[in-house]
């Protein structure tokens, strides 16, 4: 089933302000929130749809991409409501619902159990060469991660003590509160959804039960990846809370500038100087490519700025079975630091051109004719 237009989902115009988008989303989220519609699959789908639309339209960069390209212009891994369920909701929308739903919006809830939270996603920026992007690249990266505290063995409590049942929620992790005409379930303010509290925290991890560590991960960069694309490593983000799933790691790729080529999608461009004699007489020219050397024929009388297209000498994109093209933009080079003999030869050559009339320099004749008519 095709996705609905995000503006249609929220019921706002395409030129709606950020405040209008926020108000429209809040109205829909309150109407379809699972706490108000616990047994309604339809309400759950409406809630997810509104959540996804708001996440895209409340971010200026995502909104610009969506306005230009529609659903194809936004990353399906970013903000996809189905991927995370309701996990991460508090992080993205706590400013809207913090006063109404509290932290309970941040995760799922077991029946009668403490709140379960999905771990936060992590970002890692990585630079690679154009050659690595074109051919693919396997590497290792070291990223900060969390591990169970070795002093308290993950309990968060000082050795010799243990966590105790929270007296406020009686181990449930949530408390029920009434606000206006409806009752809502809210994360326990004392234990923050864990169902327990720690009278004497571990001094090593400060009661969190986990400590920072560095983790080494294998990353496979696919051939054809482009600058700014992200690689998702599922489950390698921060760990969840109370048994919640771990977040994901997103490796963002940045391609270093290349000394020869400029990339444009799957195509490559390069500027190539050629001797003026080759431009005048024509000949075979060798040009570098990412797969080795290639050659092409320069026609007699080639002018500076002429572009030659070498089909299939570009980059094979991620979703393409055919490589792009290489565009060679030739620049006719004027010789410098001439010897006296070379100067004399060029003067003789110039004289022979003048004797032959304008047929040797049609562009110059055309230009001077235009200038002459301009002053008449």
UniProtKB/Swiss-Prot annotation:
Gene name per UniProt: dnaJ
Which coenzyme or cofactor does it need? Zn(2+)
Q: Where are the CXXCXGXG motif repeats?
A: 149-156, 166-173, 188-195, 202-209
| Annotated Zn(2+) 2 binding sites | 166, 169, 188, 191
Name of the featured protein? Chaperone protein DnaJ
Organism in which the protein naturally occurs? Burkholderia thailandensis (strain ATCC 700388 / DSM 13276 / CCUG 48851 / CIP 106301 / E264)
What is written about domains in the entry's comments?
The J domain is necessary and sufficient to stimulate DnaK ATPase activity. Zinc center 1 plays an important role in the autonomous, DnaK-independent chaperone activity of DnaJ. Zinc center 2 is essential for interaction with DnaK and for DnaJ activity.
Identify the PANTHER family for this entry: CHAPERONE PROTEIN DNAJ, DNAJ HOMOLOG 1, MITOCHONDRIAL-RELATED
Q: Highest lineage ranks of the organism?
A: Bacteria, Pseudomonadati, Pseudomonadota, Betaproteobacteria, Burkholderiales
Is this entry keyworded Cytoplasm? yes
Q: Where in the cell is it found?
A: Cytoplasm
Q: Which residues form the J domain?
A: 5-70
> Where is coiled-coil annotated?
none
Please give the chief subcellular localization of this protein. cytoplasm
Give GO terms for biological process: chaperone cofactor-dependent protein refolding; DNA replication; protein refolding; response to heat
């Amino acid at each position: 089933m095709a996705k609905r237009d995000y503006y249609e989902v929220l019921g706002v115009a395409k030129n709606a302000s950020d405040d209008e988008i926020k108000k429209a989303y809040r109205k829909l989220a309150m109407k379809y929130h699972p706490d108000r519609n616990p047994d309604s699959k339809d309400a759950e789908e409406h809630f997810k749809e509104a959540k996804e639309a708001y996440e895209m339209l409340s971010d200026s960069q995502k909104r610009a991409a969506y306005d230009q390209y529609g659903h194809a212009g936004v990353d399906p891994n970013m903000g996809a409501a189905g991927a995370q369920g309701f996990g991460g909701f508090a992080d993205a929308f706590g400013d809207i619902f913090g006063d109404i739903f509290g932290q309970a919006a941040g995760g799922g809830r077991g029946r009668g159990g403490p709140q379960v939270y999905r771990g936060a996603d992590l970002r890692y920026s990585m630079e690679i060469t154009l050659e690595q992007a074109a051919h693919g690249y396997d590497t290792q990266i070291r990223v900060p991660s969390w591990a169970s505290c070795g002093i308290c063995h993950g309990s968060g409590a000082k050795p010799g003590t243990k966590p105790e049942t929270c007296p406020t929620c009686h181990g449930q992790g949530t408390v029920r509160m009434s606000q206006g005409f409806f009752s809502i379930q809210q994360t326990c303010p004392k234990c923050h959804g864990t169902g327990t509290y720690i009278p004497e925290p571990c001094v090593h991890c400060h009661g969190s039960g986990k400590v920072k560590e560095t983790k080494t991960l294998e990353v496979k960069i696919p051939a054809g990846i482009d600058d700014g694309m992200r690689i998702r490593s599922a489950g390698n983000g921060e760990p969840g809370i109370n048994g919640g799933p771990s977040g994901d790691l997103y490796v963002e790729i940045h391609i270093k500038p290349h000394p020869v080529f400029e990339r444009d999608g799957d195509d490559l461009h390069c500027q190539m100087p050629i001797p003026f004699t080759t431009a005048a007489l024509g000949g075979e020219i060798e040009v570098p490519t990412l797969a080795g050397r290639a050659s092409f024929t320069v026609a007699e009388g080639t002018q500076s700025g002429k572009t030659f297209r070498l089909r299939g000498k570009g980059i094979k994109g991620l979703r393409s079975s055919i490589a792009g093209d290489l565009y060679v933009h030739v620049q006719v080079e004027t010789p410098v630091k001439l010897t006296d003999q070379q100067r004399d030869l060029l003067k003789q050559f110039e004289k022979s051109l003048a004797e032959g009339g304008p047929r040797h320099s049609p562009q110059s004749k055309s230009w001077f004719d235009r200038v002459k008519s301009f002053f008449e």
